[in-house]
From Swiss-Prot:
Signal peptide: none
One Pfam family hit: OprB
Ranges for domain SLH: 52-123
NCBIfam families: por_somb
Gene3D superfamilies from the UniProt entry: Carbohydrate-selective porin OprB
Similarity field: Belongs to the OprB family.
GO terms for MF: porin activity
Gene Ontology annotations for the cellular component aspect, listed alphabetically: membrane
GO biological process: carbohydrate transport
Source species: Synechocystis sp. (strain ATCC 27184 / PCC 6803 / Kazusa)
The name this protein goes by in its record: Uncharacterized protein sll0772
Amino acid sequence: MGLICGLAIASGLTVTIPSEAQTISVNEFFPPVNRYQLGASNLGNGVNQVTSVAELRDVQPSDWAFAALQSLVERYGCLVGYPDRTYRGDAEGTLRARPLSRYEFAAGLNACLNTIEQLLQENVSVAQGDLDLLKKLAQDFQAELKQLAVRVDNLETRTAFLEDHQFSVTTKLYGQTITSLDKVFGDRVGGGSNEFQTQFAYRVRFNLETSFTGKDLFRTRLQFSNFLNGVEQTGTNMTRFNYDDNSNNNVEVSHLWYRTPLTDNLTLRLGTVGVGYTDLVDTLTPPTIADDALGIPSRFGEYDPVYRRGGGGAGFNWQITPTVQLSVGYLATNPNDPDPGNGLFNGGYHTLAQLAYQTADGGIGFTYSRSYFPAGNTDLMAGTGSLLAIQPFGEVIATAGNFYTLQGYYRITPHVQIHGWGGFVEAQAQGGGLSNLSNGVGGTVLRDVSWNSSAIWYGLVGISFPDVGGEGNLPGIALGIPPTVTASNLPGAVGQTTPYHLEAFYRIQLNDNISITPGFWVVLNPEANSNNATQYVGHIRTSFLF
C-alpha cells in the first residue's frame, strides 16, 4: 500500500514517497544545484526558443512566487542570518521589502532546496504541499538555477586561485640580547701578568625578517654591542668568545641577506653585508651547539672554522635527493669597496663547495674552500687558533689557503648527541719579502718569505645532552686541537707543540625566552708553545630571546 507521487523538479526528476514511512530518498527527490548544467540535449533540438516576457522581469512582492518562497522560508528557516534564526532582509519580518531580480530569487530558492534536502536526509517529515510548491518554483526558475550553478562554480575557481596565489608581504621582528660576565686566568702568553679584568658586556640584535611570497626570506639585522675580544690582554685568540662583537655601542646594519627557492630542488642565498658561510650552507653541527646565544660559548668550539668567512656574495643549494645536498658559495671580503684590490672580484674572496648527507638524526659532509687575502689583511683562520695559523707568513704577505674539512653529528638518543669536525689547510704565500711572523711566545721573528707553503691542522669532538636536568637545558663538553701550523718550508714558521682545548658548559633554560649558561674552558699550550701558561676562561652568559 504505497503512495507513489511523481514530483518533477528541473528536467524530468521524479520522487517516490513510500506511504508507510513517509520518507523520501534524497537522490530521488532533487539534485544539488551543481547538477543544473547546460547540456547538448538542451541546445541541439533545432528549435529556436523565444524567452517569455515573464522570465525577464523581477519578482515582485505581490507575485505568487514571492509569497510561496517566503512561506517556505518562514516554515523551514531556509535563509538564516540572525541569532534568532530569522532572515529579515530590508524590512524586519519579510524576505525582502523590494522586488528581487530573478537571480536573487533563484539564490533564495536554491537555499530552500538545500535545506529541505537536509531535512529529508534526517528523515524529517515534509508536507506534500510544500514539495508540490518546490516543484512548481523549480520549473519556473529552471534557467536561473542552471546559471546560478555555473556562476558558483566560476566563483569557487576564482576563489581557489586567489587562495593559491595571494600573499600579503609580512615582516616579523625578532630580538636577541646576550650579556656575559667573563674572566680569564693565567699568565699572559709570553710571560707577564694577565691583564684581562672581569668583563661584563652585552650584544643586542634585532632581526627584521620579511617574506614576499611566503617561500622566501629577507633578513635585515640591526646590532650594537660593546664586547672586547681580550686578545691584547691574553696574547692569544684561543680565549675568544663567539659573541665578542664590538660596535662601540653604535647601531649598525650587520647583516643583509635573502633566500629564495628557484625550483623545487634549488635555492639561492645572497647578501651584501655580514654574510658568512653559515648563511649559505649547513655547518653540520647540532643547532643547539652552533648558536651564539644558546650553544657552546667559545669561538673555536662553536663550529668548524672553515665557515667563519664574512662579507657579501651568494650561494646555491641543490637538493639532489631528500638526504643529499650539494652547495656552492662565493663571498667577497669587501664587495662594497671600489678601490683597487677590493670590490666583488678584485680583492679578498672565499669560494666553497660542500657535499652533505643528512637525515633526521644526523649528518656528515665534506667541504672544500679556497680563500685569498691581499697583503695587509691576512686572517686565514678567522680569529681562531694560533697567531701563526692566522698569519702563517705574516701580515704583509698576501696569502691563499685551500681547506679540506670533514664535519658530522649524530643524535644517539633524544638526550645524547655527538658532533665533531677536522680540517687540513694548505697555506700558500702569494709573493715574497721580509715579514714578521709570530714566534708563539708573544713576540715576532723576521723571515724572508718567497712563495712558501705551510700545513695547518685542527679538529674537535663534543658530546651534549639535550633536555637533561630540565626541558630546554643543555650540558655539554668538548675536546679539540685549535688550528696549528704543523709543517712549513719556511724556517721558524711551525708551532712548537700541540695546543689543546677542553670545554664544559651547562645551559639552564629558565623559560621560553631566558637562559643562563655558566661554563669554562682550558687552553693547554696556548699558541702551540709549551712555554706559555695555561689559560683558564670562565663565563656566565645570559640570553634573552623575544
